């Protein structure tokens, strides 16, 4: 007999770091710590690998602060399930675990877990808002006096078992290939959370620029046509994101805080210019942690923190 598996456990899987190594190195926030001595005696490659590991951990910490143990700010295609009652209009209003909701792909409902009826989701029967979506009946079940039913499920005040798939979060990916100046398209590692007409930022230091996805994009290809040719050339692995810059700023603060807390060779640059050893008791990391939490406060999602 097959077990009953919570689909959410296998769909919260798109975790891409929110900053790159170069973004940390070039940030004035990180200028207070010595990034060249994270691994005592290590070469440049070892130091870069150490920064990357700190970025992974800081990105996960930012997710935990905002969404609890399982969620991520990165755009993800999530399948969740729950029990819902129809409202007085006969509509099912669903508050998924995470927001912003970008699209709803599927919905099924039934009085028993094994007897759910799939509903074909479209803009005519599914109203998507930032933090909730409403599913009405199929168009064929509407009458002059309102909706009749969801397929085989008549409206009732009893809770119904629902399973739904939706996309939420902020597009966050990297360039899968280098892009030359004047290019009219970019190739990304993932197109999840990206839509035609959407503005994205290519975060590349002094060559950072914004692009807008052209209406000619087919919605699935990882090669994204853009409305205006690139101003700068960009190397592969550069971050491409719809995330607000405050999230990046917060993650860099968390990286700096981790370095100050380590006490394993990390150096803190004093205001007078003389480096001093950062011990495990270094209290200056608290200001970076506090600043990170302040920057992430707007992204707190209570529903996903049960």
Q: What do these predicted regions represent?
A:
Residues 1-306:
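Divalent metal-cofactor coordination and adjacent catalytic microenvironments
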């Amino acid at each position: 007999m097959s077990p009953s598996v919570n689909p959410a456990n296998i769909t919260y899987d798109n975790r891409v770091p929110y900053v790159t190594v170069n973004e940390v190195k070039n940030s004035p926030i990180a200028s207070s710590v010595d990034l060249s001595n994270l691994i005592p005696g290590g070469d440049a490659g070892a130091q870069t690998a150490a920064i990357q590991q700190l970025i992974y951990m800081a990105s996960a910490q930012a997710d935990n602060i905002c969404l609890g143990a399982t969620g991520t700010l990165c755009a993800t295609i999530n399948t969740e399930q729950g029990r819902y009652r129809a409202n007085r209009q006969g509509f099912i209003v669903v508050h998924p675990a995470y927001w912003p909701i970008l699209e709803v792909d599927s919905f099924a409902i039934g009085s028993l877990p094994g007897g759910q009826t799939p509903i074909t989701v479209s803009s005519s029967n599914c109203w998507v808002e930032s933090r909730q979506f409403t599913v009405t009946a199929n168009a064929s079940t509407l009458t002059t006096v309102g909706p009749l039913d969801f397929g085989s499920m008549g409206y009732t005040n009893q809770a119904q078992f629902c399973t739904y798939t939706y996309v939420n979060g902020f597009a966050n990916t990297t360039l899968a290939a280098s892009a030359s100046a004047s290019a009219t398209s970019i190739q990304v590692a993932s197109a999840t959370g990206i839509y035609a007409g959407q503005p994205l930022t290519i975060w590349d230091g002094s060559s950072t620029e914004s692009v807008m996805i052209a209406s000619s994009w087919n919605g699935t290809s990882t090669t994204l046509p853009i409305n205006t040719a690139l101003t700068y050339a960009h190397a592969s692995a550069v971050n491409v994101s719809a995330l607000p810059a405050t999230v990046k700023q917060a993650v860099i603060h968390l990286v700096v805080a981790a370095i100050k807390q380590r006490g394993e060779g990390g150096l803190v640059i004093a205001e007078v210019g003389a480096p001093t050893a950062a011990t495990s008791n270094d209290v200056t990391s608290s200001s970076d942690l506090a600043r990170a939490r302040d920057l992430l406060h707007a992204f707190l999602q209570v529903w996903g923190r049960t």
